[in-house]
Amino acid sequence: MTQTFTTGLMGAGKSRELIERFNADVTKKVAMAAHLTEETGTVGKIESRNGKKVKAIYLNKSHSKEVLEVVKNFIFMKNIDSIYIDEVQFFPKSIISDISKVAEESHVDVHFFGLSTTFTADYFEASELLLKIILDENIIKISMGCQTEGCTEKAEYNARMVDGKVAREGDTFLQQKSKYLALCKKCYFC
């Protein structure tokens, strides 16, 4: 039984990596994705920026008991060997902890994908938990370059841009679309 956490900044290719690994996995598997508005258990998709997609079961972060029941149903009723979960940063850490425990007790591989930090450079609680409980060799960090024009440094921060400037405060979860850039330390703090 293996648990992995693949993380990176916005636009680094986490969903693409999930889809590639999911398609290469020969075990009986299911893909799931945290969702802010869709009902738990509805069928949707995980789609990467390159247009590739895979069918997925949506898990609403607000429905903790339902999320765990859906996961248990796939493990025990459908005999799933591997679970791939995208956008884990949206979950409360209690859901991640419960999924991790159920998967471990059932000898099911679970592969978590998501952001580690918010636009304010604070850890998402679910991601912080995963960084603590998953073995270092099973944490995969996808890197990318700074998106500031002319900068060649490695990006380290998800920056929410408001009126062309880095926003350092505000609600973590927004319903409307916002512009984000992956920035290096120098460009983030300038």
Language model features with spans:
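Cys/His-enriched microdomains
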Residues: 144, 149, 182
